Amino acid sequence: MKKHIFYFILTFVTVQMSFAGSISEYAVIKGTISIPDFQTKEVTLYNVEDGKPAVAATAKVNPLGEFGFMTPVSAAGFYYIDYGQFKNRTQLIRLYLEPKLDINLVINKEHYVLSGKNVGQNVLVQKANEIYNEFAPFARLGGNVTYVDFYPWLDKGVAKANEFSKTINTKDANFNKLLKLAVATDVEESTYTFFRMPRTAFPDKDDRPAVIKTWQTDKKFTDPDLLKLHNGVALMSNYFFYVSVSGAAVPKRLDIVETLDHITDPALKDVYLRDVVANSRMKIEEYEKIAPSIKPYMISATSKSFLLEYEKVLHKNVGQKGLDFTYNDINNKPVSFSDFKGKYVYIDLWATWCGPCKAEIPHMKKIEEDYHGKNIVFVSLSLDKPKDAQKWKDFVTKEQLKGIQLMADKDFGSDVAKNYDVNAIPRFLLFDTKGNIINSDALRPSNPELREQLDKLLKS
């Protein structure tokens, strides 16, 4: 018994927090992981910040599988236990923490046992978690389920969730509202995520469960409490993705401000746009086009700080001198970047094995033809492996590729790939007449806006 107490105290010591306040301001969680061959040495406690999980504390797991948290709770809300299962949706352990709670958890592989001196609303929350877990296999990466399995099950799953929501009727109105929102969000977010996962069988584009159509409304996102849920932002993101792939009218990335017509709450707009910008990998030109439309909605201090850093990174290479590389053409003649001084230079980094690269070739040919004789050079620089040099030469000849055709010396280990942090292709680079960088992640030939940019440069 003393050994158990000793190890449990150690787990609390590892949690970095101040105990200046009264014990009544804290919630206590004591846990034991009872999973055979369990290896994880640390457990994370998440809270929620702006609709996403955020680390609140960590605790070491002792050799007996025990861990513990004594966490300050300034406002009641959802927290999440992660022992390695959280991201892959193996088991949701969501707790509604309030001051003075004293919770015990015994965690098994597929469920957990809840007990303690004061568990608050968490018996009800556990039932909500069980519903989430039933949806999880359909939203898990690597799952073998398809629409053949999911569609017949969905109506039953939704009905069960709706029936459960009717039983949420405690004396705490705020809790009732938040848990009902959580259940609805779990169901919808898991369903929309299903359509983002790779599958072995696919329904027709217009073959969608009828229940999903009832979730689509003109003013979809109105409740700022969505930002109190770990999957709040994910729901918004997955919803707009689902609508786009289902053939309904939804804005493309550069028209993303139009999606805000479906979001009425200012805080939701702010957080959603921040997530879009952070994850969309926009080119400089794309961002500059959309920025004036979205910045008026990104009003929080967090978003303003984010945009400041985002723009700094986006423009970090602009104006810097381009790498003066030298590589051979198909006749083994060395060609250097400096040979093009005085002209604009557009470089296509590609390889013969790259499908998306080859899809750009017709567009590249056309743009080279249309800008022939103008003050711009088009360079195609292959990142094929050195052993495939002849394969590259044969491809260039067979496809009658125009412009300047070069091959790097060490594929992705070559100086040009390392200098511009190239880890995926196709990748395009654009330089001014002095050899300085205009964009080290330029627009593709297939993007009509590239022509607008080139025309503007050539007129200046």
Task: Locate the predicted segments by residue.
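Short, internal strand/loop/helix patches
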Residues: 328, 393-429, 433
